[in-house]
Amino acid sequence: MFIDGKWINREDMDVINPYSLEVIKKIPALSREEAKEAIDTAEKYKEVMKNLPITKRYNILMNIAKQIKEKKEELAKILAIDAGKPIKQARVEVERSIGTFKLAAFYVKEHRDEVIPSDDRLIFTRREPVGIVGAITPFNFPLNLSAHKIAPAIATGNVIVHHPSSKAPLVCIELAKIIENALKKYNVPLGVYNLLTGAGEVVGDEIVVNEKVNMISFTGSSKVGELITKKAGFKKIALELGGVNPNIVLKDADLNKAVNALIKGSFIYAGQVCISVGMILVDESIADKFIEMFVNKAKVLNVGNPLDEKTDVGPLISVEHAEWVEKVVEKAIDEGGKLLLGGKRDKALFYPTILEVDRDNILCKTETFAPVIPIIRTNEEEMIDIANSTEYGLHSAIFTNDINKSLKFAENLEFGGVVINDSSLFRQDNMPFGGVKKSGLGREGVKYAMEEMSNIKTIIISK
């Protein structure tokens, strides 16, 4: 952990390689009292960050991006070992994180305040930092989703208290070293960024309830997100949570395009992406053909060691999660689901699994965070109703060549994002991103996160 510019090295908590199941490192786990002391210390730097010149913010962000680029392969290998992410997918995450820090640097200089028309007053606004941002980040994109919280926090002049997932913290430790170097280079006190490792129910909980923390930016499960809304009090909160993301294939869709996109959207990082394909709704008139093509493509995916360049699907984050997924699939079959492919587990590896189900099946209501895909044969009239029937509303997708139908679905789907002719997995780091219902509050995407992490002050001058 890194607190007030000092590294604290203890061996309190094991970090497990999800593929080999070996202990790869032992890291500190803060007590609640230590977390509280760290937040007390961080508070001293609020004025430092608030008054940090725009040019310094820009330079720090660009320097972080530069250092990440220099360590691209090293960071990708850490992601593969620590989070179980196939190496070719890990490289993509590192590249995206470089872009995220550069985006924040761009928006630092592009920010504009507003002048409000008035007959006899000069009225203008300015955005001010909230103070301390508690950034609580997940295991599945530990580098880029940390970037999505840290970069806009720096850009808006906030102090950061960063709590990474205990399941994949190692790349965040390396990121903290990179941030330390950037702060030193531009003579900024190191206490403006703090990395607090440990158990979520201890460290994460203290960040949420501590009155000195002004905002929580959390990515994780809807269950934990709901707890945060109950505990955070009057803090600002931005929650990017889960989903069972429906992907709709209409009868006029380009099937080759749909199948290729849905294979990627279903099985990248073993389905451990909040916007992975959650269920596929396919028009019954083309269902046989679609299912045959989809299953055949999934059959040839390579499952195995994340460090192998040929691996498409690596392990789930833990054996415990894989065992839970196995039970959910068994229940789905008990409820009448027809297993078309997979259903096999080997330790934390879960093989690509496809089932044909009806709309009431457990898989259509449960975020498995796994390479498990339910397919529903249905008709166009029922698709929107089925898609909107979940308690989530993160991303959805539709495949069609009819522009009128695509717009009709886009207007009626109750989701934060609707992707047309690509899978729900699509996300670009400069677009607004987030969900409705139990999928979250607020929006990420650097520009939009900067708005979340600042407060508008209105200044009125009488003539």
UniProtKB/Swiss-Prot annotation:
Keyword terms of this UniProt record: NAD, Oxidoreductase
Enzyme Commission number: 1.2.1.22
SUPFAM superfamilies: ALDH-like
Active site as annotated: 240, 274
Binding site for NAD(+): 220-225
Pathway: Cofactor biosynthesis; coenzyme F420 biosynthesis
Keyword Oxidoreductase belongs to the record: yes
GO molecular function: lactaldehyde dehydrogenase (NAD+) activity
Domain of life: Archaea
pH-linked activity: Optimum pH is 9. The activity remained constant to pH 10.0. Below pH 9, the activity gradually declined, and the enzyme was inactive at pH 6 or below.
Assembly: Homotetramer.
Protein name per the record: Lactaldehyde dehydrogenase
Organism phylogeny: Archaea, Methanobacteriati, Methanobacteriota, Methanomada group, Methanococci
